[in-house]
Regions:
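Short, charged alpha-helical interaction segments and adjacent helix-coil junctions
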Residues: 176-187
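FMN-binding flavodoxin-like domain, especially the glycine-rich phosphate-binding loop
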Residues: 2-5, 9-17, 22-39, 43-176
Length: 213
């Protein structure tokens, strides 16, 4: 059995999830970033193909949509998706399933995983204790997800309640084009410890670590 998990990550949550899923599968899989890979991808038909990505403003991030639309040989006997979110998956996986169908792809199953939020204006990830509980819960969920993948279970995609679909899907549509410019007012202060993880994992290499003068 061959397989590939494609991930898109902004701060590392989705990469962590992709790696944890891979660890729990019964057969080894490749883990590749979605960024730039469509230009060099020469993939034979996989038994399993996975898409792991964060939820952006209650929907699918533009780079993930672009990846699905621009990768004609993105195939697999079993294609699954995992939407990593801070607590509100909304209609994200339904949206992905629809876009995939429009591009001749069938989503076999779709799961959501709650992780610490990285949206600072709304409070960020919370305390270490809170984050640890989320990680422990996520690992349990990942084991269940991996079991479903190993057995190639066909499942309906997971989604939020109806009110999220109505309210948040509307917000997603209104703000989708604004996302690329939303980082222009980001800054760091003395709380930054200079670990460099953000610069290392940024998919667009938009963060530069500069020594203090």
């Amino acid at each position: 059995m061959s397989g590939t998990i494609f991930y898109y990550t902004g701060t590392g949550n989705s990469l962590w999830a992709a790696r944890k899923i891979a660890e729990n599968l019964k057969n080894p899989v490749s883990i590749l970033s979605m960024i730039g890979v469509e230009e060099k991808l020469d993939m034979a038909r996989n038994d399993i193909t996975g898409l792991v990505f964060p939820v952006y403003i209650w929907g699918v991030p533009a780079p993930v949509l672009n990846f699905v639309k621009s990768t004609p040989n993105l195939k697999g006997d079993y294609i699954f998706a995992v939407a990593v979110n801070g607590g509100q998956v909304s209609n994200t996986l339904v949206q992905l399933k629809t876009v995939m169908a429009m591009n001749g792809l069938k989503l076999s199953s779709g799961f959501e995983i709650k992780m610490p939020s990285n949206y600072i204006p709304w409070g960020g990830p919370g305390t270490k204790e809170h984050c640890q509980k989320l990680y422990e819960s996520a690992e349990k969920k990942i084991k269940n997800i991996a079991s479903a993948i190993n057995n190639k279970e066909m499942r309906d995609v997971e989604k939020g309640p109806l009110w999220q679909k109505i309210v948040f899907s509307a917000i997603y549509k209104m703000t989708f084009s604004m996302v690329p410019g939303m980082d222009k007012n980001f800054w760091v202060n003395e709380k930054c410890n200079g670990c460099g993880i953000c610069a290392k994992e940024c998919p667009r290499k938009a963060i530069l670590m500069v020594p203090e003068a």
